[in-house]
Amino acid sequence: MKNYGVKMLREQMENIPDIPFPEGFGIRNYRPGEGHIWTRIQRAAEPFIKMDDGLFEREFGHHLEVMPDRSFFVITDDGEEIGTITAWWNPDWKGVEWGLIHWVAIHPDYQGRGLSKPAMTVAMKRLKRSHDRCFLNTSTQRIVAIKVYLDFGFYPYLEAENSQEAWTAVASVLAHPILKACGF
């Protein structure tokens, strides 16, 4: 399958799934100076994007003061950081402010253990405190992630270039009621 960049929307913040972490795992807030931890996790987990040392600063450096409130690390009971998710925002997308689920990653050694949905619960609840709607960016080869996002009530954004082709490809390998409701 060709790897298209896609956007997904959630136009309201009600009925956020409340998924607890499995035994042995939890979540904590980012602490100042922990960009290197974020980078380590992203490098380990990211198959498509080159993670250079300056990425964290480019993505978050202009708003480091809000990171402890908006960025989270999935941790083991021993305190090892093995995942990350950020409840960010875009001040002017489509003419209004939107919350943004941003840079979700679970270290490959811990993928498949049911950690993404609990992390999404935490980030979505944080977004709900400040935003009436949210979106995220992902790509079509991240089928497991797309299923998580669909399960959290995100819909395909269909106004982007190649969106019909992209979501048709996703629907060819992932059956989901939201995709069906969107005509795929």
Language-model regions: role of each:
Residues 1-23:
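Acyl-donor-binding surface of acyltransferase catalytic domains
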Residues 26-38:
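A short beta-loop-alpha structural element at the N-terminal edge
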Residues 30, 104-106, 138:
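Hydrophobic adenine-recognition pocket in adenosine-nucleotide-binding enzymes
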Residues 43-106:
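A conserved beta-strand-loop-helix scaffold within acyl/acetyltransferase catalytic domains
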Residues 103-108, 112-128, 147-151:
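Conserved acetyl-CoA-binding loop-helix of GNAT-fold acetyltransferases
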Residues 127-138:
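Conserved GNAT acetyl-CoA-binding A-motif
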Residues 136-146, 162-169:
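Conserved beta-strand-loop-alpha-helix junction that forms the acyl-donor binding cleft
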Residues 150-159:
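Conserved acetyl-CoA-binding loop of GNAT-fold acetyltransferases
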